[in-house]
């Protein structure tokens, strides 16, 4: 399969590290971890189909492309397409070729709408996508929190949140300290409920428990760093920081609160515990990202001292 002058072949597990290196080369300020990439490739989501390809020039790897979609459980069939090229070989023609190839495969699978992402400061990619007919659909806000500069503020917020949780008889603890044998099942159900209320254009598809546990066992997560909130028998919420084992910045993997836990300050309490733990572990900064219309969590980020980074833009076009 060709993409401009690039030859595409099916990706193999051992190519995951190359893709992490490619993404890191494109945005050195946002290094990606090859260990996490490889684990993600080895443990696909059973509710989705994904195809990955490596692009070569004269036998040398220079590009990556993919197309993925859920198992068509929603009324509108959204196909995710993407790809990129190493900086030295990155041209509009090659990017355009990658999207042409992936759109063709996605369309053949039955996609009705293509969706992809670009950073707001990636002019070349945005120009290519605009010429292909893509239009901005929504944005993802990206943030960074300086744990050194904001330590005093965060300590005060954490103390206030702990008191508020005590007053409401809500227990906040890491999941390794929870002796409930059903804790992961309850966490999975709560997370699915919380995810349904996150603003989105592409509908959320409830994930299987087996896929959830693959994620819980992924290299960046540890049970002693997964914070949950409980009210008696119920799991109300969760907040998790991912710690890249090889390279990268510590960042939020997921913060979610079920409907029974909202309006109680649970999300703030959980996020405070994750960052206080990060400080104790010697981390100097953490990052997070949220949908641009998720007002409650955006407000928490602002009050904690997070500062904006470039947005991610979701773009769509008809197939």
Q: Which residues fall in each region the model found?
A:
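Acyl-donor-binding surface of acyltransferase catalytic domains
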Residues: 1-2, 86-179, 313-317
């Amino acid at each position: 399969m060709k993409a401009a002058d690039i030859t595409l072949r099916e990706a193999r597990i051992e190519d995951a590290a190359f893709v992490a290196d490619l993404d890191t080369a494109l945005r050195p300020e946002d290094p990606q971890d090859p260990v996490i990439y490889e684990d993600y490739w080895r443990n696909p989501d059973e509710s989705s189909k994904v195809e990955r390809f490596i692009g070569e020039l004269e036998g040398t790897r220079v590009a990556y492309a993919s197309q993925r979609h859920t198992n068509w459980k929603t009324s509108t069939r959204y196909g995710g397409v993407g790809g990129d090229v190493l900086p030295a070989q990155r041209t509009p023609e090659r990017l355009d070729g990658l999207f042409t190839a992936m759109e063709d495969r996605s369309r053949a699978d039955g996609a009705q709408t293509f969706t992809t992402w670009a950073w707001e400061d990636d002019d070349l990619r945005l120009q290519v996508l605009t010429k292909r007919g893509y239009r901005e659909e929504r944005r993802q806000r990206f943030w960074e929190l300086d744990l050194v500069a904001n330590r005093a503020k965060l300590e005060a917020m954490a103390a206030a949140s702990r008191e508020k949780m005590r007053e409401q008889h809500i227990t906040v603890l890491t999941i390794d300290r929870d002796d409930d044998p059903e804790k992961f099942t309850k966490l999975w159900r709560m997370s699915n409920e919380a995810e349904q209320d996150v603003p989105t254009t592409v509908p959320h598809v409830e994930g299987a428990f087996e896929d959830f546990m693959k994620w819980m066992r992924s290299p960046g997560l540890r049970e002693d760093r997964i914070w949950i909130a409980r009210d008696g028998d119920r799991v109300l919420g969760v907040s998790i920081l991912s710690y890249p084992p090889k390279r990268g910045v510590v960042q939020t993997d997921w913060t979610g609160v079920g409907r029974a836990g909202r309006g109680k300050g649970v999300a703030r309490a959980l996020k405070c515990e994750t960052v206080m733990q990060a400080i104790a572990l010697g981390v100097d900064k953490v990052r997070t990202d949220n949908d641009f219309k998720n007002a409650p969590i955006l407000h928490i980020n602002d009050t904690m001292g997070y500062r904006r980074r470039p947005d991610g833009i979701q773009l769509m076009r008809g197939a």
